[in-house]
From Swiss-Prot:
Gene Ontology biological process terms, A to Z: clathrin-dependent endocytosis of virus by host cell
Keyword Repressor in annotation: no
Protein name: Capsid polyprotein VP90
Listed Acidic residues bias regions: 660-680
Originating organism: Porcine astrovirus 1
Lineage: Viruses, Riboviria, Orthornavirae, Pisuviricota, Stelpaviricetes
Amino acid sequence: MASKSGKDVTVKVENTNGRGRSRSRSRSRSRARNKNVKITINSKPGASGGQRRRGKPQSDKRVRSIVKQQLDKSGVTGPKPAIRQRATATLGTIGSNSSGKTELEACILTNPILVKDNTGNNTFGPIVALGAQYSLWRIRFLRIKFTPMVGQSAVTGTVVRASLNPTATPSSTGWSGLGARRHIDIVVGKAATFNLKASDLSGPREGWWLTNTNDSGDSTLGPSIEIHTLGTTMSAYQNGPFTGGLFLCELQAEWEFSGYAANPALLSLEKNRDDDAEVSFDGQQGEPLTMVVAEDSLFNKVATRRSTFTRGIARDGQTKSETIWQVVDTAVSAAETVVPPPFGWLIRGGYWFVKKLAGRTKLRNGKQTSSYVCYASYQDALSDKPAICTGVAANFYAGRTETARANLHFTQMNEPSTGVGETPTAFRMYRAAPDDIVYLRFKPETVNISVSPAARLFLARKYTAHSLKVKGNSGTTRIHCVVKVNDPMWYSPDWEQVAQPGPIPGVSLLGGTTTIGIVTAAYQAHMWGLHIATAFIVQVTKDINPACSTSCVLTKELNDQHLKTVAGQTSFNWSLRAGETYLMMSFGAHTSAVGEWVWNDADISVGYTIYNSPLTPCLLLTEGSFHIVLPAKRGLIPLASTELFTVRDQDSIPQTTEPPAEEDVGDNETEDESDDEDLDHFDLHDSSGSEPEDEDVENNRVTLLNTLVNQGVDLARAAKISKRAYPTLAEKTRRSVFMDSLIAGCGPSSAWSEACKAARKVSFKEPISESRGHAE
């Protein structure tokens, strides 16, 4: 701003909050509300200046410099920049239009830690490095440069529009609505530049934005630049669709940073693309909208590796990750038609935000899939407000959801832990347990059959159609009984929820001669004598109705603790549906050595005894609102006797090679006293009589554990109560000898050594040599 010589230039900046000042209010009160900055510039040069430029007006540049200096001093422009960096970032290519509709080709976020290309090269540049070191950022200017990759005469039918979205929030804006924004139209084949000023990109804090994306979304992301195409891209030379890239997109900008605050983890946020990915959407009325992708897809692999989950076990199995991902679909396809209402517009808009669900793998169209909760904005994802469906998709039914192909460009938006991972000073003790064992907690249900009553469990003796067998590389096992698995949840030996195991290689379910399912886990236990009990957790991939001509039912005689089979009254059919999970059991005899997997292809006979095992509740409790816990292996490996029961709690049991410290004895006594009240409610063990067999003790533990779990007791707590209520003979001997030795004056090390030696003698496991680490 300039003026004539000899006159003043006055700049007045008013920052008024609310309505104008009332005359009745005092002057002091009005000054507290309104902040006015008055700058007066004398445009008449001084003596020294007049000698050099006599009679010439001041330049606009000098006036702007003085105004900016005064505004900075008054504090209305926020903190002073600590560093300024100008850089050019290559963002990737702008693809062609394949549908003729408005397609989103790119969504460019201006936050410096998110300025990366989508080629999977996640090395950081100077802008990302500075963004991870400072808490505030703003942009002085920004240019989006479009370099054509094809000639103007090579393709026809498509126009490109780049527009500014100040809120970086998905919307259902059409082509006309994009024209109402700050935008530029680009002709294919010609270079173009989209210029934006600082006033277009200013943030809510005197023009500044926050860098850490873990903070509120409306003050961190900054504006976004969306690039859309309209019209099918056709090749002028081949008279067919053109599928290549149209432009190379580059971002040129100058960032300013202030407020040093190092967050090193923000350097490694990932950005990549997954072309031609299979995507589907689930959701029923009142439930969150979920995106389902193949478990072996690039997006799911990256998201699984980088996601951070809240520790603990959710009741509904829907533990959400704390890591948020932006998903951009650059291929408008049938995806929007398979979305439950009312969020078809969200998918049609081209991008949304998701969080990964833990332990929610499903079988869909013969493939393992993972689920992600969808959010309509980044702020909704931070505050965990998912998109809630008001109905289901028109073509939706269980296990048969339609999938669509999509080109997914995904960006990791945040990192829950922003510091450098250091060596922990406290370690958690894990018990030594094989990695191949898992525990399945589920609600059993009788499979629908064609005879009455339907709730009764039937065992198949003779098949007439679609005989069920599990086939492996070295044999087959005939299925005698089927139970439907509802609400499955998988746990590790430390009672931490884990994902569903993958298919066992080389093992499948046959219906006659046709493969109809995959086996994800197996159970086999050697019972008394030569008897074995086998079970498979199977996911059926095809609908089938196995038919049996003769059947068996279960009975229990008086004073007999085991089950027996008796002849059934009629034939029956099982009804198995694709996408469902079933527990398929088989019983028989074996002649192989203990520890080897046994294949049993024989029919079950009338009068066969089924001895008590963890499978017994699955045979008896086949309806009701309760859950059963069953151990299983990820391969064809029989369960050892110590793995059959889920109530082992070795964290509180010292190893035989290391004696407990003196304070550990006191802790154990305190735990015993604290558990007295719980044990009184479940006093199922009579210590006054003879010692029960260890196998009966284990069976009683399982029964008590299931009872406690059904009554709402935590799994770990139920396991501890069951273990203390039914100790084995070796455990009783070890504790008795240990306490007697302490009373006799022995030290803790010597007492524990004697106790372990006595326990090994009771269990017939005498070691070859004694441990050298314990003095007698």
